[in-house]
Amino acid sequence: MKVFMIGGTGLLGSEAAKCLIEKGHEVETLSLPSLPKGAEFPKEMKIVFGDINKMTDAEIEAQLKGVDVFVFAAGVDERVECPAPVEAFYYKYNIAPLERVFSACKRVGVKKAVVLGSYFAYLTKVRPDLQADSKHKYIRSRVLQEMVCENFADEDFAVCVLELPYIFGTQKGRKPVWTILIEQIEFMDKFPFTMYPKGGTAMLTCRQVGQVIAGACEKEYKGFNAVPIGMYNMKWDKFLSVVYKARGMDPQIKIVGVPAWMMQMGMVKAVKDYKKRGIASGVNPMQLPHIMNYDLFIDNKYAIELGATEDDINSAIEDSIRVSVAAYEGKAELLGMLGEE
């Protein structure tokens, strides 16, 4: 099987490439020119440097000829800060490439696509009462992304969206997206306790994501499929204990679960900061507490069905946090996301 990826040199794409190559498949990826310093990629993976947003339709078609599966392992999430209008930013990186590549896929006969999506789209299905897609522009963009995938899917072109939760693990030379968490919680270090929402989240490691992507490439899908993915469900208080341990702090620091209205009071500072810096947030800070007070958990059966195996999630969290702290403190020269996951 020949697989063409966008984002194969990113944290998640490179893990998928490793798994696919180990399974005997051929992998080629389109990558932005800047590669993380020291990162290792499978020598069997062919890397083509370029920007999908600057390629012609003919160039895209040439890349897709003879390909069995297209994997979109690129894009940006809600933790990437961007200027207004945020809707245009998300469209450029998360949706527009799919519209162009899917059209080319159908013209040259590619039969399947696997897209790395977000579990926030899954949230809108299990908790429509939260109205997350109307209150948060990032979540709306992920719902629109799935709509585009569904519109292109048919009996001759299958599309599988992997609704991914929070992911932990590191890639040498690349800046983790978790630096934003360090910024958010550092001010509470001086207190004898930490106030945080009562909810929790699904999660998995980057290695497990690679396994799931490879499994989705191999699985026989028909039409459109959206699959919620997660291997572990963790409450926020337990998660923060692991974070504190990674930061060299006492993991037994008391963590007090607070209601949404109380967290909203703390978000006023974030709103003012965004406004001062001209940043448009894809997630409404004043509405986020309602999501974080919910246990956004996922049954791991879907990930296991696609080949995910056990991993050490606590170690992956600790690795992510240690590198994030180094980046936040300016002690490491790391490459940002650049639209690749």
Question: Predicted regions span which residues?
Answer:
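N-terminal Rossmann NAD(P)H-binding glycine-rich loop of SDR-like oxidoreductase domains
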Residues: 3-23
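Terminal hydrophobic/aromatic helix or amphipathic segment near a protein terminus
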Residues: 240-296
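NAD(P)H-binding glycine-rich loop region in Rossmannoid oxidoreductase-like domains
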Residues: 46-96, 100
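Conserved Rossmann-fold NAD(P)-dependent oxidoreductase catalytic core, especially the SDR/UDP-sugar
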Residues: 96-140, 160
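A conserved pocket-lining segment of Rossmann-fold NAD(P)-dependent short-chain dehydrogenase/reductase
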Residues: 183-204
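Glycine/proline-rich active-site loop of Rossmann-fold NAD(P)-dependent oxidoreductases
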Residues: 169-182, 216-227, 249-251
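Conserved beta-loop-beta element that borders a ligand/cofactor-binding pocket
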Residues: 148-173
